[in-house]
A protein has these predicted regions:
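Nucleotide and nucleotide-moiety/phosphate-recognizing core
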Residues: 3-4, 12-116
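Short, glycine/acidic-enriched loop or turn micro-motifs at the edges of active sites
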Residues: 9
Length: 116
C-alpha cells in the first residue's frame, strides 16, 4: 500500500494505492493552512479505509516545484512516516503529477506552469 502526498500547490491531494488501483483519495483546496490540515486529513483517510501506517509499503511525496511552505509540510510528514515505519520514501516531481493527471498515454509531455 502506497500513501501519496501532494502539497505543492493550494490543491492538496492524498491517495492510497494498493499496487493495482487507487483504494481511496482525498483532495481539497487549502488556504495556506497545510500545517494544521495535513496530518488530520491523513488520519481521516486511514479511518475511512481501515488502513494503518503498518500496512504501508512506501510513501510518495511531491517534491516541487511548488509552494515552499506546502512542500516542506508534505515532505516533513512523508519523511516522518517513512522513518518511523522504515518505509521507502519516493519523491515525485510536481510537473510529472500534473502531466499524468491530464494524460495517461505513454508519450512525451510538456507542462508549462505560471510562476509567481
Amino acid at each position: 500500500m502506497i500513501l501519496a502526498i501532494d502539497t505543492a500547490t493550494d490543491w492538496i491531494g492524498l491517495a492510497l494505492h494498493d499496487g493495482a488501483a487507487i483504494l481511496a483519495e482525498f483532495g481539497w483546496r487549502s488556504r495556506r493552512t497545510q500545517t494544521i490540515e495535513l496530518a488530520p486529513a491523513v488520519a481521516q483517510l486511514w479511518g475511512r479505509t481501515g488502513v494503518a501506517p503498518a500496512d504501508l509499503s512506501a510513501v510518495a511525496v511531491a517534491i516541487g516545484p511548488g509552494s515552499y511552505t506546502g512542500l516542506r509540510v508534505g515532505l516533513a510528514l512523508a519523511k516522518g512516516l517513512a522513518l518511523a515505519h522504515n518505509l521507502p520514501l519516493v519523491g515525485v516531481p510536481t510537473l510529472d503529477i500534473v502531466a499524468r493527471s491530464v494524460c495517461r498515454l505513454e508519450t512525451d509531455l510538456v507542462v508549462v506552469a505560471q510562476a509567481g
